[in-house]
Amino acid sequence: MKSFRVNSIFYTLQGEGHNTGRAAVFVRFAGCNLRCPFCDTEFDSFTEMTAEEILAKVVSLHSSSVPHLPLVVLTGGEPTLQVDEAFVGQLHSAGYRVAMESNGTRPAPANLDWLTVSPKSLPLTEGKEPIGKEPDEIKIVYTGKEIETALMSYESYGSYESYGSYETYKSHETHKSHETHHPLLYLQPCDTGDPVRNAAIVQLCVDYIKQHPQWRLSLQTHKLIGIE
C-alpha cells in the first residue's frame, strides 16, 4: 500500500493569495527538490501515512455538523514529489475541494481544484516538464531583487509556454475567457525576520503594483494575526 511522508496536518485559515481567509486543512508533505535561502517552512521531519490515514486525520480536525467542508491545501516542501491524481480523487470522494501550493518544477495533478505556483529563480536539478494542471495563480515571494529579471527566469522553466510570451502572460490580470487561461498574479513580500528590511520590501511591492496594476498584493495574514 502506498504511503506518504507527511510533515504535519493542521486546521487553520489560508493566509496567502486568492483564498486568503478561507477555512483550510493543510496537509504538509515532507521533502523538496529546491533549497531556497528565504524558506520559512520546516519540512524535513515526517511520519509515514497512508491516504486513508491522511483522510481520517483531515476529517477529525473539523466539526461534522457544519454544512460546508473546509478547503484542503496540499503543500510542502514540494507536494508534487508525492501527490498524484488518485490521492486527490480520494479527497474529492470525501467531498473536499483540493488546492495545492507548488514551486512549479514538476507536473501537478490535473484534477486539482486550485493550483498556486510560486516559482523560484534558482537553478533546477531536473529537466523541463509541463505542468499537468495550469496554475490558477502565480505567487512570487519578493525579496527585493529585480522582479522583471526574476519573471524572465521563470519563463525559461518551460512550464508556462501555453500562456504565450512573457509579455503576454504578465499583462493579464484574471482569466479572460474559457478559451485562454491566465493565472492571477500575486506579489508577496518576503519575511526576512528584519523589520526594517521587511518594511522596505513591502514598500517596493506597493510601488511595483501601482505601476503594474495586473499584479495584486499577497500578505502572510496568518503571521499578522498570530495563527498557524
Label each region the model flagged:
Residues G17, G21, G77, G132-P135:
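Glycine-centered flexibility motif
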Residues F4-S8, A23-A24, A30-L112:
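Conserved Radical SAM active-site core
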Residues L13-E16, C36, F46, L61, ...:
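A broad, structure-centric signal for solvent-exposed, well-ordered loop/edge residues
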Residues T12-Q14, H18, R28, V73-L74, ...:
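Generic detector of intrinsically disordered, low-complexity, polar/charged segments
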